[in-house]
Amino acid sequence: MELDHEYRPRIHFTPAKNWMNDPNGLVWHKGEYHLFFQHNPQGRQWGHMSWGHAVSKDLLTWEELPVAIAEDDEGTIFSGSAISDGEDLVAFYTRHTETNQSQCIARSKDNGRTFVKYESNPVLDENKKDFRDPKVFKYK
């Protein structure tokens, strides 16, 4: 889809439609930069938070991909981070409910095109309403 609109940013990524906030999880993996962001795939207002996904080879030209990590019956998907373990992309994100936020993991074995949530999620749960945005990085 060609986006040519007077009020759209020319350098910063924006999705083709609907709500976006909190870019997170920028990571280089197998020849591509992966940008994840909070995204409401259902509308232009805040809600139904999932992780949107875009890729770029030069950080200027972006290709929007389908939602990387979607909300489910266990909660919506808030910000976090992502790392490359050399083979796979691993995402660390916040699962949000009305009463609790916890930290979860999802893994992609196909260069970020699909993610599978870890079956033992949450991996960190302090039973708190405001406990979000895990920052994870790989150290040699």
Regions found by a protein language model. Give the residues of each.
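Beta-rich carbohydrate-recognition and catalytic domains
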Residues: 1-140
